[in-house]
Amino acid sequence: DLLAVQSAINEGELSLDELREKFFNEFCKFDKFLTNYFVNRQQRLQRDSLRLSMSGSNWRFPWQADLANAVMLTPQPRRISWWWEAQGNVGKSYMARYLALHCDAVVVTAMKKADMLHLLTKTLSGARCVIFDLTRTTEDGSVSVVYEVLEQLSNGFICSGKYDSTSLFLQPLHLI
């Protein structure tokens, strides 16, 4: 019974392996769906916990307050905000995580263009902004991929040919 599996997952007392043991027949038929449901529930709980631990706006740096305020405004079409520092430990990755948890941001790291576009087509629904959180050591080739994807996002239309090919029309987003 799928409702019994859902209930057991929502109770959160059993591991995924224990759920598979207890609901063997259901997992035989719907393993991918039930595993995704379990993982999504775990992620929701993790996000809620992180959101609580990162609540408040005690910014270490003035630019963080400026950025937090900027993403609450209406996005400007084709505007890309670039935040860069030669040194580390100035709060950029922290800010990316904060915006993902509190302001409906999607955070993207360096990866192949096809993977990046696939990720975006799966996660942009309801997003207010897209943040590219790149390390200082990110290779130039990876950065040029980010430029290409930023161009598509700023045009309001992205295409992904990976797996289940799709294209999306987008409202203006904050691009950071």
Residue ranges of model-derived segments:
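P-loop NTPase catalytic core of nucleic-acid-dependent motor ATPases
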Residues: 2-131, 135, 140, 169
